[in-house]
């Protein structure tokens, strides 16, 4: 039992040190923040495209209804 304690303690110590280094690197990466990744750009552009399509469809529908009203003289 005693012979296993030292190697396990040593491995635990090395694991905690490497984990702390990973957290520091992750924190440094998150501090940049000014850069947008390609996925974020794609997501923003897709959202803008969908909004523009929705607005265009709404405007087109309104224009068509107005023209139909003018042609039928029903308004």
UniProtKB/Swiss-Prot annotation:
Entry's localization field: Secreted
Originating species: Sylvirana spinulosa (Fine-spined frog)
Function: Antimicrobial peptide. Active against some Gram-negative and a variety of Gram-positive bacterial strains. Active against fungus C.glabrata 090902 but not against C.albicans ATCC 10231. Shows hemolytic activity against human erythrocytes.
GO biological process: defense response to fungus; defense response to Gram-negative bacterium; defense response to Gram-positive bacterium; hemolysis in another organism
Signal peptide (residue range): 1-22
Expressing tissues: Expressed by the skin glands.
Positions annotated as propeptide: 23-40
Pfam families per the UniProt record, alphabetical: Antimicrobial_2 (PF08023), FSAP_sig_propep (PF03032)
Cellular component annotations (GO), alphabetically ordered: extracellular region
Protein known as: Brevinin-2SN2
Disulfide feature: 69-75
Main location: secreted
UniProt keyword Signal, yes or no: yes
Top-level division of the source organism's lineage: Eukaryota
Keyword Ligase: no
Family assignment from sequence similarity: Belongs to the frog skin active peptide (FSAP) family. Brevinin subfamily.
Key words of the record: Amphibian defense peptide, Antibiotic, Antimicrobial, Cleavage on pair of basic residues, Cytolysis, Disulfide bond, Fungicide, Hemolysis, Secreted, Signal
């Amino acid at each position: 039992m005693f012979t296993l304690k030292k190697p396990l303690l040593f491995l635990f110590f090395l694991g905690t040190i490497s984990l702390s280094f990973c957290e520091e690197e992750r924190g440094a990466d998150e501090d940049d923040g000014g850069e947008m990744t390609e996925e974020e750009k794609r997501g923003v552009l897709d959202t803008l495209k969908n909004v523009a399509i929705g607005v265009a469809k709404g405007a087109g529908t309104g224009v068509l209804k107005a023209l139909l009203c003018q042609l039928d003289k029903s308004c």
